[in-house]
Amino acid sequence: MSSFSQVRNPITGQATWQENADDYDYHQEVANAGFGDMLHDWERNQKYYAAIKKTIKRMQADGREVHVLDIGTGTGILSMMALKAGADSVTACEAFLPMANCAAKIMTANGADKIQLIRKRSTEIQIGVDMARRANLLVAELLDTELIGEGAIGIYNHAHQELLTKDALCIPARARCYAQVATSSLAKQWNGFKLMANLDGETLLRVPPQLNECKGDAALHDLQLSQLPTESFRLFSKPVEIFEFDFQQHLEPIQKQRNKVVPLQASQPGSADMVFYWWDIDLDHESEIVLSCAPFWAHPDKDKHVAGEDKPLANAIPWRDHWMQAIYYIPKPLHLSNTKETFYLSCHHDEYSLWFDAQLKEPAESIERHHCTCDLHLINPRSRIGQLNQSPRNKRYLNYLEETTTKDSQFLVLGNSCFLGLATCGLGAASVEIYDSNSLSRRLLDSFIKFNKLENVSLLEKLEDVQDHSKLTHIFAEPYFINSILPWDNFYFGTLLLSLKDKLSEGTQISPCAARIFALPMEFLDLHKIRAPVGNCEGFDLSLFDEMVKDSADKAVSSVEAQPLWEYPGRALAQPQEILRVDFANFNQELHQQGSIELIRSKECNGIALWVDWQLYSSESPKAFVTSGPSQPIEIGKFVKWDMFVRQGVHFPQTRTTNATQVEWQIDFKPFLGELNFKFDLKSI
């Protein structure tokens, strides 16, 4: 049997009915559940196991039976650890049924049938109905990058009230959250909007007051903080502990809301713009087994790990992608005039999230969670906001626009939040029409139009509202569309051009005129682990989990996924190769290309990076191209420097080999269907 679901194709812009097997949603959920990279986190696994062994041994030495509850068991790995460590009984619960069913098979395969598996949320479990007794040892992994974003507070409070004995121990036993105040001209680009100037430095677009007054979005910006270039930020304080969460609750339940004011002394003058955030956990009651999520410069074990040419210092500490670090942007940057100047960091959390502020005077009351009031943060992801502020990128566009714009130019601009389109007004264009289908984006652009008193520009909700196609001299796009995820999703620009083609004058200039997709074989240090099979984990066979994930990924996951590759170091194994060129003047042509890339560096190829170069005009000069890929020339065998304000595509080969000599590739592009299909094979020749 099959079912149909309505999906929007990003390239055609059309909502179509897609036929799926009845279990498609199941496979999609399994493939994207994200258990895999946790199981590749060797430090997490080893320390959890060590804490389980130690705690059970201690409880038994005290003459206590050990009855374990594992909340959110996943593969069942923690339950099997507890059983093997000698627990008298183990109860595991898992509400995600595909994972629960897989866990049952894994437990059987590992001789752990004694574990009682409950296919419910822990908050639905009843003593005497689902469990024979209260547990006196809770093992769980309920945390995320924010620590509390997955509901850990409520789950722990309920467990202690309903499912655990009063003297129960927990693994982990407690957590501590840390903050470090910083400034970064690079990271600030993800949070605001800079004025736009021409190549001579003259202002083209001034920023409306509502953007400068907006406090931004309080939500965390999660990222691999260790990969932020050290020269791109300055620290105003040492890391400070801001909150502790006692999961064992021997004194009282975890509070759902708290605020704390931390006095700090500035280590240097400057503008305090943001808070770097992370946490650590004590896995055992005595705080002897600690797991830290700190960035490399603040990591307690950084001196124990050896850095070298093959693994930089930023990657010498244990890698994980499920628990990263985060940036919280301070609502109003605080100017610190002097070294050792005292200021106050206000820290707040509710049941699911945190937020921060910084002030020169100690605040008398709690500060409410702030939110966006200017639309910029509501409609644009962090990467897009950064892209809007990216000076080298904007200069490429402005160079083209300055050279081609005259007093007779009449522009049609296509895309969402295209401020470069507004800038053409300041360059002297006779008229500018901007087609932007998103109402919030149009409202944001309109605020710039009014504040800058632009009179020769109009915003269009529908493409049919263009006044006179025959008078258009230029069609321009970056291109960027809100629904795009992968770089080539912005080929929607070509679809829009097709609808205009018969109405345009012959001499209408189109920019970009073409797009080129490039492929680069990579040896990633860690990124490939998110799709790599686990096999054996701490002595437990998890191959059934690998089979389940592979089967679901084959059915429901695209062969290429979007990732911000600057966060995931990897070496180039060859020079990049152009695998597809799309001419927007002939966008209706179906294309099929194939070829091979010779691997110059003989290492494991565990990923293929993909990106788009946009050709602004007909020239092979580097100035004619805007890339979404590497930001510096590729050196084979060296780490690739990636554009930090866009996600690239990446394909993970299903077969792993260390002796591949080339990558064979095929690509098929069907513009009317909005299909772009890739196929890659590693070959040893």
From Swiss-Prot:
BP GO annotations: peptidyl-arginine methylation
Classification via PROSITE patterns: SAM_MT_PRMT
Domain SAM-dependent MTase PRMT-type: 14-355, 364-685
UniProt-listed Enzyme Commission number(s): 2.1.1.-
CDD domains, sorted: AdoMet_MTases (cd02440)
S-adenosyl-L-methionine is among the record's keywords: yes
Keywords per UniProt: Methyltransferase, Repeat, S-adenosyl-L-methionine, Transferase
Taxonomic superkingdom: Eukaryota
GO molecular function terms noted in the UniProt entry: histone methyltransferase activity; protein-arginine omega-N symmetric methyltransferase activity
Classification via Pfam families: PrmA, PRMT_C
Family: Belongs to the class I-like SAM-binding methyltransferase superfamily. Protein arginine N-methyltransferase family. PRMT7 subfamily.
Functional summary from the UniProt entry: Essential arginine methyltransferase that can both catalyze the formation of omega-N monomethylarginine (MMA) and symmetrical dimethylarginine (sDMA). Specifically mediates the symmetrical dimethylation of arginine residues in the small nuclear ribonucleoproteins SmD1 and SmD3.
The protein's name: Protein arginine N-methyltransferase 7
Natural source organism: Drosophila willistoni (Fruit fly)
